[in-house]
Amino acid sequence: MLTTVLSGGLVGLIFGFILQRTRFCLTGGFRDMYIARNNTLFYAFLIAITVESIGVLFLIKLGIIGNPYEDFSVLGAIVGSYLFGIGIVLAGGCATGTWYRAGEGLLGSWVALFFYMTSAAAMKSGFLVPLNQLIAKHWVINDDLAGQLGIPVWYLLVFLVVITSFFVIRELRKPRRQIASLPPRYKGVRHYLFEKTYHKYFAGLLIGLVALIAWPASQLTGRVGGLGITTPSAHLISYIITGDSKQLGWGVFLVLGIFIGSFLAAKGSQEFRWRLPDLSTIGKSTLGGIFMGIGASWAGGCTIGNGLTATAIFSSKGWIALPVTILGVWTASYIIFVKPNKN
């Protein structure tokens, strides 16, 4: 248990710290692709996927990590990811975004997090299990994309590296706007940890490294997998309700670490403060959290479990879920932000 606590908690703490300090929000990034025609954060996300993919595929090849591929429902990945994409716009953050913003003191994120956790728990082990199984048993295929295509996985990795490099290099060649900033208040390590603003591409690199480290770190406890948020969140609420210590796996300490890491980063940068949402935000956060929990359960993952971890191993589920999640974000963004301005 000590290995589980330290391994999961430390990876989560570092992850949460990075997310808070770099303001790495996939909900905002996917929304900006549509509304602002700004793909910067999406390209940073591709960097994270690519970095993780290079490392984890070699770990699998060396036998350090076991076979991560499982069967999944294509219907669940499509319907669930679309619903999840809508939910994260309503909630104001994806799974990790909700966890790290809760650590900053946003009470709206606490509301979204509660309903996300409880609805996911209900889908996985509660009264909504029949609803979960309703879709999970349809259109089931294996997760191994390279195997389905009949090609070595290294071909897919080379393609990913080329595509990511192309977009990143093209973006870096564009003239950068000079943004006015205040003179630094701190010096040394404190400045770099709690004050300096980092480019989103650097954030993507760091997140990719953390995602890579998560694989062998969780393997130490017998768990085959990388970063994942939904199932651990469901297990945490189940433990709180039932007291069943079997629910306390590596992932539970990962998500708790994300919360603590974000809190420490927010306190150190003086960005932590309790913020009370209005009734409209509470309503959206509630509905968004429910959509997130149900959607991620159907899809078998969230923007991290599917969008980052599964895509890195060239999981069919991951590469179906990611674009469908983005489509869900765009749909909700149109309804909530674009359409009212047209009227």
Q: What kind of region is each of these model predictions?
A:
Residues 1-343:
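Membrane-interfacial helix-loop segments of redox and metal-homeostasis proteins
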